[in-house]
Amino acid sequence: MNKKNHEDSNSFKKYSAIKENDSVDVVLIGSGIMSATLGIYLKLLEPNWIIHSYERLNKVGQESSNAWNNAGTGHSAFCELNYTSINKDGSINISKAIKVNESFEISKQLWAYLIKEKILVNSSSFINTVPHMSFVWGENNINFLKKRFFYLKQNALFKDMLYSENYDIIKKWAPLIMEGRSINEKVAATRMEIGTDVNFGEITKQIFYYLKNKSNFFLYLNHDVIDIIRNKDKTWCLKVVDNILKKTIKINSKYVFIGSGGGALKLLQKSKIEQSIGYAGFPVGGQFLVTKNKKLTNNHQAKVYGKSPIGAPPMSVPHIDTRIINGEKVLLFGPFATFSSKFLKNGSYFDLFSSLTKENIIPILQVGINNFNLVKYLINQLLKSKRGKFNDLCKYLPTAKMKDWSLITAGQRVQIIKKDIEKGGILEFGTEIINSKDCTLSALLGASPGASTSASTMLDLLKIMFYDKINKSEWKSKLNKIFISYNKKIHESYEYTLEIRNYTSKILSL
């Protein structure tokens, strides 16, 4: 996308104020990648539906979807070791890796379709080829990586994966991680050439820029949804604050999607649906070390993921990433966990405390008691100085110099805590759709893998909220045009996997 396109995608014209007690078909709360994806689905499937989207900030995609607030990894389980666990018999469970990879392939199909339809423009502004690598040292970790490679290689999705313990080969793949390292040090790496770096914020902006220029779609920035109430006719009444006019308006909607990231839990609680009882959120922030030094950025073209320390949560996997943000190449290393009681980067310090209820306080306390390693990890992270964080970087880049790197604060993640009969409360690290009994209201809670699986996750949501339409010929016909693998399993055939990937790679210029 040229400079003018970038400026255009940021300039969202202001609509006239909402009319009191307006009735609409769908309300999208939040303007991140999830709401953008659901919004484009509904506009393609039901162009005559009236859709309102409310965003409390003055721009779309400014929380977790923003390029600087996430790692930008097209999560495809190529390099993330936490998606492959060890079974009791010592074998490797690759089921989650398959699910995550297939989900990302679905996202690429959606973006390819949107490029063909000129809804998205200039694919290099939001997705670029960056090989994905796993990199470990130490005998136990090397044995794990070798075994993981063996099991993944047998599946069509990962058949093209490479493995090496050879110093020179790994140095060719990623020079910076081997410079300054002894040639006798035992290390191992895997590599997938077709990995990507994704700017989810750019995708979000471009989709909303298209949507807000279409009839029957209304984007309201600086509008904050503060309450959701069930009407007698089973529709939903939303109280919306116009932060420009300092006015509260009521709006009625047949369907509501709460896609406001960390803000979703509190709005879900306000809806008072039975299914929300017992859910809580645990906020975890993140920091990255970043460099724009061209001597470094020009000498590293990969996303290199390591192995988490024992007891550390999945979101703690250390990685050194090539990023392309607004056309500029940078390197990021992290994440380093931070703690704030905010549920959103631009949220309130009261977020955590105001989300506490008599139903979720016990699950939260039980999670703290039952996850001592997590608590210990977070305390250690909070006590770690910039020098300590730089020392972690040196494990991956032995020749790194502190003067080249600065520390940035990324977005907030709110992990799911929910009631459990046996343990009282459990901490979940994935995402989960919570919906009302009649499926007219849904919320997305949780974090990783998040944005990478947005197309697949919102397809699942379509099946829940619009179960009476998803199998009708009109919707099926359209969905089959968008997704050439719709309702098919990609991983069952290597030839089919190649066909799908060649199709999307050609359109997305990968």
From Swiss-Prot:
Biological process per Gene Ontology, one example term: tricarboxylic acid cycle
Alphabetic keyword roster: FAD, Flavoprotein, Oxidoreductase, Tricarboxylic acid cycle
Molecular-function GO term, any one: L-malate dehydrogenase (quinone) activity
Top-level taxon: Bacteria
Record's catalysed reaction(s): (S)-malate + a quinone = a quinol + oxaloacetate
EC annotation from Swiss-Prot or TrEMBL: 1.1.5.4
UniProt pathway: Carbohydrate metabolism; tricarboxylic acid cycle; oxaloacetate from (S)-malate (quinone route): step 1/1
Flavoprotein as UniProt keyword: yes
Cystine pairs: none
Cofactors, names only: FAD
Family: Belongs to the MQO family.
This protein's name: Probable malate:quinone oxidoreductase
